[in-house]
Amino acid sequence: MKVGIIMGSKSDWPTMKLAAEMLDRFNVPYETKVVSAHRTPQLLADYATQAKDRGIKVIIAGAGGAAHLPGMAAAFTSVPVLGVPVQSRALKGMDSLLSIVQMPKGIAVGTLAIGEAGAANAGILAAQIIGTSNEEVMAAVEAFRKEQTEMVLENPDPSED
């Protein structure tokens, strides 16, 4: 039971590694791969169609610019696909966000925020999905959420350090 983290190019890794770091925190196994919707369409088709049989339970797909990777991956598989819009230089990721979020009815992509926050949250969401059938992963997610709460409660006054 693992997660597939795919991205359109190697330059997307600095963003997408945050998804991997969150999965590491929850002890969720994953694989990473560059799979370009435009430059390697057959590789994308093969990856997505074989994902379920290879034990992939969730695909996290990050892409910038035209950002067709998440939608095309979703078109080829019944495995849940989480789309991460990678921030681009030209439009600061808005182009990526709109490309990923505007899917036609019938092909679902869970779209996250632009950039690093979206990648980290994709890792968390993938762990939550895995956790629905894995008590250890769910316990790790719940512990993380508790830590988040405690960090806020420890110092609720922003004027104090």
UniProtKB/Swiss-Prot annotation:
It comes from the Bacteria. This is N5-carboxyaminoimidazole ribonucleotide mutase. GO terms for molecular function: 5-(carboxyamino)imidazole ribonucleotide mutase activity. Catalyzes the conversion of N5-carboxyaminoimidazole ribonucleotide (N5-CAIR) to 4-carboxy-5-aminoimidazole ribonucleotide (CAIR). PANTHER family: PHOSPHORIBOSYLAMINOIMIDAZOLE CARBOXYLASE (PTHR23046:SF2), PHOSPHORIBOSYLAMINOIMIDAZOLE CARBOXYLASE CATALYTIC SUBUNIT (PTHR23046). The gene is purE. Its EC number is 5.4.99.18. Substrate binds at S9, D12, R39. It comes from Aliivibrio fischeri (strain ATCC 700601 / ES114) (Vibrio fischeri). Belongs to the AIR carboxylase family. Class I subfamily. Pathway: Purine metabolism; IMP biosynthesis via de novo pathway; 5-amino-1-(5-phospho-D-ribosyl)imidazole-4-carboxylate from 5-amino-1-(5-phospho-D-ribosyl)imidazole (N5-CAIR route): step 2/2. It catalyses: 5-carboxyamino-1-(5-phospho-D-ribosyl)imidazole + H(+) = 5-amino-1-(5-phospho-D-ribosyl)imidazole-4-carboxylate. SUPFAM superfamilies: N5-CAIR mutase (phosphoribosylaminoimidazole carboxylase, PurE). Keywords: Isomerase, Purine biosynthesis. One of its GO terms (biological process) is 'de novo' IMP biosynthetic process. Pfam families: AIRC (PF00731). InterPro entries: PurE_ClassI, PurE_dom, PurE_prokaryotes. NCBIfam families: purE.
